Amino acid sequence: MAVLTHGSPTPSGAHFDGKGINFTLFSAHAEQVTLCLFDEQGQERQIAMPARTGDIWHGYLPGGKPGQRYGYRVSGPFEPSRGHRFNPHKLLIDPRTRALEGKVGDDPRFTGGVSQPDVRDSAAALPKCLVIHEEYDWQGDKPPAIPWGNTVIYEAHVRGLTQLHPDIPPELRGTYAALAHPALIEHLKTLGITTLELLPVQFHIDEPRLQKMGLSNYWGYNVLAPFAVDPDYASGREGISPLRELRDAVKALHNAGIEVILDVVFNHSAELDVFGPTLCQRGIDNASYYWLTPDGEYDNITGCGNALRLSHPYVTQWVIDCLNYWRDSCHVDGFRFDLGTVLGRTPAFDQHAPLFAALAADERLSACKLIAEPWDIGLGGYQLGNFPTGFSEWNDQYRDAMRGFWLRGEVPRGTFAQHFAASSSLFEQRGRLPSASINQITAHDGFTLLDLLCFNQKHNQMNGEENRDGSDNNHSNNFGCEGLVADAAIWQRRKACQRALLTTLLLSQGTPMLLAGDEQGHSQQGNNNAYCQNNILTWLDWGSADRALMTFTADLIRLRQQIPALTQDQWWQSGDSNVQWLDSQGQALSDAAWEQGCQQQLQILLSQRWLVLINATDHECEMHLPEGEWEGIPPFGVSDHAERLTTWRGSAHTICVLIKRD
């Protein structure tokens, strides 16, 4: 018969110390916490937690070993109007569990009750927490520590990136192990990628709505257990756990000089709205973990049914501990925060919010690359440029300006230039560096680059919402034909814009982020919200990749790394050697001239040597070059037997880079 001694309120979670397991659980409003232990046959033993220190319930299991399955039942008031939804009929997952065994199906037993507690027991349906204790030999692994000025981010999904790669063994495709495969690493190295940003690898579940339609949450933003590695991306090889496989991947990428950033989800939980499943925080301490309205309803500022109350002292520490766990146990180099405005809500957004202060005070985490998606859907949710020093931010204004300039003719060159210069008006006055602007043309959320040039309308019928989901504001241009089938003239214009947008992205000041597959010409058939498409729609088709475009992209990244104005991470100042803005005649643009003449033509001289020529019009143009001898460089020309140029004739929707001869 298992007996719990008092144990200790620290460390948090379930920890094996060599002689037993110490269990802790936070709940400020519970009346009783019961530890539930499960054997291999699923038989449950319930033991009341014997001690409480402050709001931490704790107990120690002598003789407990790694592999122990467990969960919790928490008793207390069921008073929804006051935010309390305790229900001991529901087995609950430890918010700090580092592994889970099983899956969460669409099961009515997870219902906690809306106005009255649901009395159906959920233990048989709920995955069990696992106590793990895994040593790992990092073999001297060190972070690549890529300076921000040299950083080129590649946003990718573990499965989407590797599932169809022909040079990766079939049994490893779509897994963490595939990330460590030499063929994948060679692609990243050849391309010039410095930093791999992975969509969520935290343990996530599929929403009941998707399960009913036979779909899944492919992107993985419906996180249940943020400390746990998602086993769906593990190869399942004998003796190799998901955690070890991910560690192996990070180590291999580090050995190749590539950083790893994880996309993490702390804005909401997988419990969704009041009608969603009771799996974890709702039953542990609903009033502490979630933002609630005065009448106890969920304040749905995320659009996902709930929002985590990250300003609560314990919840703040929960996030900090989780980030440190990933940093320490998996050696990751940084984090991208989904719907990052929630991090700073108190409930209004505050640069000095408790979580921001805790991140800044943590020497290990503050040294990581921290990236925010600077919005949520709540009041005051759009916060681009307002995050504290130490954060970089996804820049949707850059995205829309570059799309509008090249594809719609709607953006004047002054606006283009402002965003080409790392959106200085957003970041410089707030004491941030250019690298704070994470420049992107596309991301996982939206059209791929190719689809941006082939579709004026979204085509999301496969998502099962009658094409209502996904953005209608895409700033795209199909050049007169909806879809991938078009005549040669249309494809010529599309490919010109494809290269122009890639060039703009990779030669802008700030931190470029390339969506995996854009360098290959990947299409999602016009689906701009493929979050639930775990199939060939989202998996990169390596067999049909545009090899010439891949070479073009690699040449661009190499070119970027040669230009000091782009790598030194300092703001460009008027009159300095970093940048000169010129008109089509090669003359410096005065303040008045910015608003005159053709608004889709421009020359940009970088570091007094590299000349970027831009013709975003729909017709050919001729530009007079500034004084000096100019020649083409890869990927825009061949340096051998180079022609010395004094003028440049550019086709429609064209960008070119020349270098000044010494």
From Swiss-Prot:
Known catalytic reactions: Hydrolysis of (1->6)-alpha-D-glucosidic linkages to branches with degrees of polymerization of three or four glucose residues in limit dextrin
Any Gene Ontology biological process: glycogen catabolic process
UniProt entry tagged with the keyword Hydrolase: yes
EC identifiers of the protein: 3.2.1.196
A Pfam family it matches: GlgX_C
InterPro entries, sorted: GlgX_C, GlgX_Isoamylase_N_E_set, Glyco_hydro_13_cat_dom, Glyco_hydro_13_N, Glyco_hydro_b, Glycogen_debranch_bac, Glycogen_debranch_GlgX, Glycoside_hydrolase_SF
Active site: 338 (nucleophile), 373 (proton donor)
Family designation: Belongs to the glycosyl hydrolase 13 family.
NCBIfam families per the UniProt record, alphabetical: glgX_debranch (TIGR02100), PRK03705.1 (NF002983)
Role of this protein: Removes maltotriose and maltotetraose chains that are attached by 1,6-alpha-linkage to the limit dextrin main chain, generating a debranched limit dextrin.
Protein name: Glycogen debranching enzyme
